[in-house]
């Protein structure tokens, strides 16, 4: 019953997030699977090309993302930076690994400024190794350049949820 309530709260948050950012915005995708919220944001909404400095436009979206995370103090949010497969280097950043991690930490700093508890945040860079689509065209490369926010139960709570579900399934 508690999980059902949590799920309905999560769904309410997600639908309000979709409404506030504009459900038809192709640069933002929001999904909920088994109590985990996935928010994927195109890099063109967050950063200028090759940069890890968060744009002013992004801050409105990040305010809403911060609310989703702050409303779930028992959850963690992993911020994953993703790039396309084009080699990248600009003197400061060595490659796509650097760019993906720097983008993740830039988003984390913004979320922290917006009041999210830093102990809930995890920085992750995926470079170009988890593409949504192949990197053959400019359009596809643009789809692969994104930041994904994964809001999930803390690992010990996650195991507790699984254990409870297993007990329910076995009729204990």
PLM regions with names:
Residues 1-31:
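Extracellular/lumenal/periplasmic "stalk" regions immediately C-terminal to a signal peptide or transmembrane helix
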Residues 46-64, 68, 72, 82-171:
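Periplasmic OmpA-like peptidoglycan-binding domain that tethers envelope proteins to the cell wall
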Residues 4, 44-46:
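A broad detector of the eukaryotic-type serine/threonine protein kinase catalytic domain
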Residues 32-36:
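Short Gly/Ser/Thr- and Asp/Glu-enriched loop/turn motifs at secondary-structure junctions
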Residues 37-43:
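Short, aliphatic-rich beta-strand segments
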